Structure formats: C-alpha cells, structure tokens
Amino acid sequence: MSTCVEQPTHSASLDPTAAQRLPYPDLPVDILRRSSVRGSGFVAAALVSSARKADDDARHDDDDPSGDRHETYGSHYLANLGVEQSVRDEGTVDAWVESSQSLIRLTGKHSLNGELPRLMRHGFITPVPRHYVRNHGPVPRGDWATWTVEVTGLVRRPRALTMDELARDFPALELPVTLVCAGNRRKEQNMVRQTLGFNWGPGAVSTSVWRGARLSDVLRRCGSMSRKGGALFVCFEGAEDLPGGGGTKYGTSITREVALDPTMDVMLAYQQNGGPLLPDHGFPVRLIVPGCTAGRMVKWLKRIVVAPAESDNYYHYRDNRFLPSHVDAKLADAEGWWYKPEYVINEMNTNSVITTPAHNEFLPINAITTQRIYTMKGFAYSGGGKKVTRVEVTLDGGENWLLCELDHPEKPTKYGRYWCWCFWSIDVELIDLLACKEIAVRAWDQSLNTQPEFLTWNLMGMMTNCWFRVKVNVCRPRHGEKAGLAFEHPVRTNQPGGWMAQQKHLETAERTSAATSTTNQQFTMSEVRKHASQDSAWIVVHGHVYDCTAFLKDHPGGADSILINAGTDCTEEFDAIHSDKAKELLDTYRIGDLVTTGGAEQRSPLELAPSPPIRHEGPAAPVIALSNPREKVPCQLVARTVLSRDVRLFRFALPSSGQVLGLPVGKHIFVCASIDGKLCMRAYTPTSSVDEVGHFDLLVKVYFRNENTKFPDGGRMTQYLDSLPVGAHVDVKGPLGHVEYVGRGGFVIDGKPRKAGRLAMVAGGSGITPIYQVIQAVLRDQPEDKTEMHLVYANRTEDDILLRAELDRWAAEYPERLKVWYVVSQVKRLDEWKYSVGIVTEAVLRDDVPEARDGTLALLCGPPSMIQSPILPNLEKMKHQLDDSVVSF
C-alpha cells in the first residue's frame, strides 16, 4: 500500500505518545505494529482500513469481497494537520493532560467538554487530538503494564484481563466508527427552553479508526452464561471518581444480545488511529459500541459484569434519556421517569448539518456572481449501522427538495453495516438563492428514517435532529458597500448569535412589552461594561440587558452579589445559582438586548477556531487572593478530614503560600465547579481565621442522595466536594455578602455603619459558619472587644451539631462574652440532654437571646423555612424591628 501524507515541518511533535509521555509508558512495539493504520494517533487520521479483522491469521476469507481492504479511503480526504500547541488545564487536577487548543470548551476550564469547530476540514477521519471530548470529571491516570479489566458476574470463569492479554490473546478488530454525543445540537433546544444539559453545538461528532478485542470474544472466553442462566445485560464501569449519586464511577449497560452479536462490532478498544488512546479518550482501554450513543462507550474501562438486570449506576439512569416533552425535572423525580426503560437512548437517530454556507458568510451580488454555481456542503449520519441513503436540500420551506450527491468513504462491514458519517454536496445557481429565505437539509437512512421538520424539546436536550436550517438575508454589510447574501446558522457554539438567538430575543421582547413599558433598546457589550458600579449596575443574561441598580438594596445576598458581575455577561453564573422564580423577577429590570458588532470573520461555527492564547509573564501574586471580586481564584484541595458520617473539613491552598484569602468577617465566597457539564456555584463561609496564611478551611455537611425525600438527588456541590480527590482544584470567587463585622461591635450592613453591644444569634445546621466567624473575631480581640454574644443553635440531632467542641470551649473560657444554647429535634437519651428539644420557640428565644433594646442586633443564618417561621415571628414578638435590628446572612 502506498500513501502520500503531507508531513508537518516539526516531526518531533508527531511522536505517537507525545501527549502522554509523562503519565504513560509506550505501548509494546509489537502491538503498535499490528495495526494497519501506521504512525501515531496524531497523523494516522490519513489512513483508514475498512471494517475487518486486523490480524491476517484471524481474518475470514469473505471479510473483504470487494478487494484489498488495506487501501486508504482516498487522499482527497486527507487534511494537513499542521502543528499546534497543546494546552494543559493548569490549576486543575487534569493539569497533566494535554489537549488541543482547537477544541471549543463548553463547560469552562474543567472538566473538559469540547467540540471541534473546523470539523470537516480534516475529512473523513478526525485527528485524535481534535476528536470531541465528553468528560464528567477528572481524567484517571492509567498504566498499560498494571491496568486490568475485571470480567465477573454471571460468567463461569471470572478473571482480570491485563492489557497485554487483551491485545495479544484475542483476535483484533479494527474499523472506523463515528462517535456522536446524544446531546449534539443541544443548544438549539436550549434556545427554545433550557434543558438540564450544556450547549453542544453541531460538532459533537468525530470519526476514528478503533482497534481492539471483540467484546463477544472476551465474554465467550470467560464463559458468559445464557439467558436461561439469568444473563440478560452486560454492565460496564470506568475508573473515574465522580460526584453523581453521592459518589460513584461512570457506569452503564447494554443488552446481552448486543454484546454477543458479531454483527454489532462491540469492542474493547486500546488503539485509536493507529496509536494508543489519549488520556481524554480513555487510555488504556475503552468500550466502543458502533451506531450507539457515545454515552454507552465507557472510557477507562475497569469492570465488566454480566448481570440479570441493567446497570443501577447513577449515570445510566440520569443521562442519555429521551423523556416526553411534558416532563420537567420535578416531575421526573417525583414520578420516577428516569427509571422507565422505554426512554433510554441506545441507537442514534438520523441527522444532517449544513457547513457551507458558513455562519456569517457573505456572497456579493453582481452581474458576474449571479451567473455562478454555488456548492453547498455538509455531513450526515445515522445509527444502528444503517447507511445514509439520501440527503435533500430545500430552498422553499419543504415544498420542493433537491437531491444531493453523497460521498461515502466507508466500506460496509462483512454484515453490511455502516458505522460512519458521510458527506453531501449540491450545486445550486446563486440566482436561485436570491429568492430564498431559508436553506434546510434532511437525511434519510436505509430504513427510510428521516429528520422531523421541528425539534422535540425534552428535559435532557437529547437527540436534536430537526431540519438544519440556515437563514438567507439580503443585506449591505457596511455603508457604501454593495449588497449581497448573508447566511445565518441557528446557533453559534459557545458564542452569542445565530438566528435562533435573535428569534428568542424577539419572542421575549413581545411577551415583556405586553406587561411592561420597557423599550426594546439595543446595547453593545462595550456600553454594558461602563455600568459596573453601585451607581449603575447592568448585567447581561441570555442576551438581554438588565439594569439592576434599583435592586441592589433588596437583593437577599446583598449588593455584592450583583456588583461582582456588574458590567458583564453572567448568564452561566446566574443560571447556576438562581431559581425559576428569580429568573421571572429579573424581567422587571430588563432594559434591552445585547447586540454583537459586525466585522466578524465569515465562517461557520464548524469552521471557526479560537486564537492561540497569548502568554504574558504575569506580576507577582497579590498579598490578598480575593483581590478582584470579579475573578475566579483556583485553589487546590490539600487536606480532607472526615469528622463524621456526613461532615467533612476541607483545606484549600491559595495560589501563593504567602497570601491570605482576604475575606472580611461576615462575608462569604462562592465555590464554583463544573458538575455533570454544568456550572454549579454555592456560597460558603470559611471556618479558618481571616489571618490564616496560604490556605483556608471549609466545614461542609454532605447531603447524600436518597436521604431526604424532598431532595432525592442530595446536594450537588456537597457530594462533589466529598468526591474530590486531594490535589484537585476548585475556583472561588468573592467576597460577597451584605454584612461585615469590622470589630469591637462595629458592623457595615448594606454599606451603612452600625454599632451593637449585644448580639442575638440564631443559627440552623451549616448556617453556623458565618456566625462562627463573628464569634471568632470578637474573641480574638479580647479583652478590647466587649461585645456580648448569645447563640441559639438548632439542629436535627445532637450528632449534627457542627463546631460544638469549639463553641463549648469558648463559652467556658469567655462566659461574659458568649452564651450558647442548643436545640435539637430528637435526642437519643433525654435524661442526658440538658438543652431544648423540638423547634426554636418563643420561650427559647426569650430565655436565651436578649430582647430588643438599643445596641442589640439579631444575626440569623439557617434554612429559609426555619428563619421565616418560627424565628422571625418570635423575634418580632420580642420587639425586634425586622427591617432594622434583624439581619440575615
């Protein structure tokens, strides 16, 4: 076989294990040599073998009725990969993993979830570093020499297979397979109504040549039992530690029939495009289930269990489900929709995308261009091994359809299966586009499955395969220039814009104008940035501009919560911490819409690529870590102490060992993390002293899944932190809050100074932490600080009382400064409990906190239900002025 591959200049960058040299040893040379896809995973994208048994001694004579299967799929699909600088996730637990800067990151810095913008430029086979990535958490470190895959359950010969055994003892299968995330094109659904998923564009699809051992061979070698023996499913589990379900691995399952069916080509893959798997793609071994949602293809595979039932893993039930459109998150939880088998996603549906014309592409109109032919292009795919047999384009809303030319580089398998995407193209006269308002495409497969005209919204935003529509507008790009045709895609990946965004803005404006007198003004981002102060605080959420200045004094979290994002697009952070009710309230403050300026490069979301980052030598780290409230500060987990079944003490190191956190007493921070692909932010108050250098401590009560019927999923952030390994990073942001203790009875509340000689403190559960900070500050300034503190602290049980040892010790050492009274809902031995049982009643408050008089301030922090009733009504009975002398953190 002879193949011409254009070589990049710097050959050193083409080392097949360059991206994993530190954490991984090279694969054994004899294993690499067996692949017909020569070279590394970086450049072997040029070479594609057909679906076949790769070992000559294992091939069937009739595997290749059409001739030599070692030929390439055509040099015209070969793209010059070039040499690009890999980037690392600095400041995260995945800092050791190299990833392509070409990928558009969709969920922040970590974990990596990204798609390739210049998808079709690389042809039929996607270069490994540019293959789309879907990670739920940190990337496990693997070692070929020590890694094993356990095969257990309903098998007669359970065993732990080494990587050498998988690669040498089983006939190798090698074939190209297109992987697609079931959430591909999800951003289109999110423009209609927000789903539970993040904004995939149309690029969550990639194709590689995978090599591995057939799963059916492995199961037969281990003696898989029959259906009569109870074997109905095969379950898979990866190695990564994830927060879902209170802490688990990623797991899922397929039916036994699919696992053992030789026509389905299910494999345990250990090579991709002729080289070892890269860390982000599952090194050293992953599952490949062709034609299926990639959510079944477990990476970093560690366990295979033949079982009588499908996987009970959290991610098997809470991901890759296509629920009916009427089911929202509350209904899904309340009625158990997650567990209904008829809504599980396995085979992918039929889909197609337009890549040419690109988004913002402009075609001038003149006497010459109107005589030209314009070639439209795109790609299409289907699931279940079905061949895409037809792609059609309409220029008139579906009244008439034009048949496209198909390009199928893939050859069918021995059993007639097609596991890969194909390309389509069609020539149209430019003059025909002048009367066209919209271009739409649809594909058909061999079972005559096609794409619906409109999308079907569903809770997880899965299986978006409606017609892909590109709007056509006659416009003049700049004053004085000639008119032409401008094309607009439905959405832009990880950027504002697209005709669906404009449509949503118009619909929202129509609804809002009926209820308010808001003008539909348009603002640029540069105008918004000018309004970033207490005098004028604007924010952008989902493309709308809001003037929140009037709400600064009323925000429950204080003005800081708004000012920290004033002048910015804070869509992701707003969605991460606000309820639907808060989102409705926001409409009151809408003043217009955000517009993007012209002059953008005329390229599609699938063609745009981010510019390489410009690295500057930064100044020395500031003494205060939280020197800029608008910036997130990466902090590394350096210690984790288990204090009880559900209480943890976490110590996080600051970026510099000489820094202090810089959090004023009474304020809090946001801890930020990407959990299941979505930003999650929660407020915490450190328990460490504000003077601590180099680190801070968080005391966290973990709310586990299925322990509270009202919140069956438990706490997203607390479970995430509980599963976080030492060495991992989280981002913190702050300070925030409207209460600050400045010492010796002095407070600043909503920006106004306040003096208090007596503090009536009421805390519930983990709400003790900001009050604990105030107590700590008062007692640290003894004997100068004369403030008297009276604390009533409520919990469910005695074991739930946080920081009790410290509180009791301080109360004993400073009886004139601090008095503590506990209230619990239930006790083990009533005769041994000297405090109150039940709820915080008026009698408890009258006995244990001071009544209202000059110099008394009530500080509250706890669950809203507790604060609203009984605390506030009872304090009001004690003559406390709720709008003056009562403050909630």
UniProtKB/Swiss-Prot annotation:
Record region (Disordered): 1-20, 52-73
EC numbers on record: 1.7.1.1
Binding site for Mo-molybdopterin: C181
Cofactor annotation: FAD; heme; Mo-molybdopterin
GO molecular-function terms, A-Z: FAD binding; heme binding; molybdenum ion binding; molybdopterin cofactor binding; nitrate reductase (NADH) activity; nitrate reductase (NADPH) activity
Xref: InterPro entries: Cbr1-like_FAD-bd_dom (IPR008333), Cyt_B5-like_heme/steroid-bd (IPR001199), Cyt_B5-like_heme/steroid_sf (IPR036400), Cyt_B5_heme-BS (IPR018506), FAD-bd_FR_type (IPR017927), Flavoprot_Pyr_Nucl_cyt_Rdtase (IPR001709), FNR_nucleotide-bd (IPR039261), Ig_E-set (IPR014756)
GO BP term (any one): nitric oxide biosynthetic process
Stretches with biased composition (Polar residues): 1-14
Binding of FAD, residues: 682-685, 699-704, 711, 716-718, 766, 769
Domain FAD-binding FR-type residues, every copy: 630-742
Region forming the signal peptide: none
Source species, domain of life: Eukaryota
Residues that coordinate or bind heme: H555, H578
Domain Cytochrome b5 heme-binding: 520-595
Keywords assigned by UniProt, alphabetized: Disulfide bond, FAD, Flavoprotein, Heme, Iron, Metal-binding, Molybdenum, NAD, Nitrate assimilation, Oxidoreductase
Cofactor note: Binds 1 FAD per subunit.
SUPFAM superfamilies: Cytochrome b5-like heme/steroid binding domain (SSF55856), E set domains (SSF81296), Ferredoxin reductase-like, C-terminal NADP-linked domain (SSF52343), Oxidoreductase molybdopterin-binding domain (SSF56524), Riboflavin synthase domain-like (SSF63380)
CDD domains on file: cyt_b5_reduct_like, eukary_NR_Moco
Record field: catalytic activity: nitrite + NAD(+) + H2O = nitrate + NADH + H(+)
Assembly with partners or alone: Homodimer.
PANTHER family documented for this protein: NITRATE REDUCTASE (PTHR19372:SF16), SULFITE REDUCTASE (PTHR19372)
Functional note: Nitrate reductase is a key enzyme involved in the first step of nitrate assimilation in plants, fungi and bacteria.
Family listed: Belongs to the nitrate reductase family.
Name this protein carries in UniProt: Nitrate reductase [NADH] 3
Species name: Zea mays
